[in-house]
């Protein structure tokens, strides 16, 4: 998407379309794929990155109505999956923040208020569980809490609102 935006070379947008369609066709959600390509961490991240990339190529002409329907269908599958993927581990780890940030964005994008509310509830619980009294984060690695904090700040600042999602703030 970014290569298309920077160069306006249609080959980049066409390649993006082929890659995302190929991924959707070849990597369905199965019990087996939940252990690798469909781990909840990657599924949450994919929501954000796919929504961003769709926005980047939308003026290229490659985003046909058929491809858009296919992407939206796969994103609905992501949302349904993320709704049911929640356990004690996600309530304290960066995985919970990243997957629920994805669910939050999908809730806004697909106008599923119940997903948005659930994601916000889970993010709030994660924040209260994973941040210690001294301000340190449970993961004990600077990368994880910074990424997690950035996602929480985006949510708190309203970058997951319908207006900002449709305006390209993703």
Model-flagged regions — what are they?
Residues 1-170:
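Aromatic-lined, polymer-binding surfaces characteristic
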């Amino acid at each position: 998407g970014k290569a298309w935006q920077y160069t306006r070379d249609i080959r980049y947008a066409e390649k993006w379309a082929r890659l995302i369609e190929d991924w959707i066709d070849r990597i369905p959600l199965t019990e087996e794929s939940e252990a690798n390509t469909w781990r909840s961490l990657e599924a949450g991240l994919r929501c954000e990155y796919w929504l961003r990339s769709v926005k980047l190529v939308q003026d290229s002409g490659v985003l046909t109505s058929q491809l858009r329907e296919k992407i939206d269908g796969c994103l609905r599958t992501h949302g349904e999956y993320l709704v049911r993927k929640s356990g004690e581990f996600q309530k304290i780890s960066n995985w919970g923040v990243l997957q629920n940030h994805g669910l939050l964005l999908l809730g806004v994008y697909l106008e599923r208020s119940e997903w948005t509310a659930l994601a916000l509830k889970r993010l709030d619980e994660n924040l209260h569980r994973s941040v210690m009294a001294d301000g340190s984060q449970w993961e004990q690695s600077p990368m994880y809490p910074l990424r997690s904090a950035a996602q929480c700040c985006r949510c708190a600042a309203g970058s997951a609102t319908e207006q900002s999602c449709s305006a390209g703030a993703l």
